[in-house]
């Protein structure tokens, strides 16, 4: 029995400490990596933010008539970091909007998004969601001849999602007229949109809704929804230039807003399209029995920045070049054989070259000629290391990372590790740019989270121990049950002893 109890205890503790990487929940390392990736995007305009999406009809609602199962899959997709959701919607016989191919109403589906937004509406976890709608024709109803029967989709969004969370065309017009937009370095022809930081924290919005075709916007007009002219929504039938092998191709792609590519992806090709500047819309067909296989596709697309199992700060191996160890600084590791790069954690005291970016251009790079520690590169803002008109920097989007790969391929380095402007020196697990003295924007939340993660296993152990003690207190000890019988045995034994002093 003791083995069973302690086995249960060990399982509980391990389940608290560990977690699956990308499905149905994020491991702690994956969560930290995604959060740092979001933070380096803070000054990027929201139309250029790389994200991963799904065709919700195929991924969550296909192969089941169980509404609860489908909505649980949607909740898991939200929790692991999927941000864009393509939804085919249609009218039922009563002209209610439903998810095409299911009996689930659009309002019920939006309620799942609303619950997620409410639970993640804090500095630590907030991120942008994009909803992409397409109204489909069915045999029971028609969008022609009965417009008075159509539901008010603006009212549906307000009731089930919340208008306060939505970024609308009128808000965009105001922000453009007020200058609340992000600069478009390197792509002057790109339309202006606000930065992710302004979107999430200044005006506290969480979602943008688009129609993907003009037929949908004509049938269901709404001041809360952007029309298809704002999108660059491509499918597998559209010829796409990928991979991007030169800066001219990179700049052409960067000028496009809201770049989405819907197709059936494999784990191997989804990263390539992500690095080409497109946000993939996963069109793979899943059902409740196979949905766990989406993990491999998500792993190769959600994180375009960090390598697998990074950021890993736990290795305390001494450096060959210094006796000091502080694994709190990031490098970009370039692999010549496949012309690709990932971020990894390195000892801040190691001597390495550093990455510089031209001021006012997101796609022009340089590498310092001299190697130095991370701290030395940031002394006096790195003066003397970067070329003129360049500053210490890092790739902020997947497309910028691709342009960096193209630049490094011309230098032909073999296994280079180059400092990028990213560190967690100030607060563990809070990765920030602007040098080692930069403060963590959510230091209080991180400290609280670290404290909770530290005491949770202990709390579980204590709870199980208390439970065992309570169980033992309910179970009566056998000698108490047979008290009278044992008393008679003892008295009989004492009476049988010989009296007097032995000779």
UniProtKB/Swiss-Prot annotation:
Domain of life of the source: Eukaryota
Chief site of localization: membrane
Positions glycosylated per UniProt: 43, 66, 96, 140, 152, 227, 252, 312, 320, 338, 389
Residue ranges crossing the lipid bilayer per the database entry: 451-471
Cytoplasmic side: 472-503
Keyword Membrane: yes
InterPro entries named among the record's database cross-references: CTDL_fold, Telomere_Capping_Maintenance
Extracellular side: 20-450
Annotated signal peptide: 1-19
The keyword Transmembrane helix appears for this protein: yes
Sorted UniProt keywords: Glycoprotein, Membrane, Signal, Transmembrane, Transmembrane helix
Places the protein is found: Membrane
GO cellular component: membrane
Family: Belongs to the MTC6 family.
Function comment: May be involved in telomere capping.
Protein name: Maintenance of telomere capping protein 6
Lineage start: Eukaryota, Fungi, Dikarya, Ascomycota, Saccharomycotina
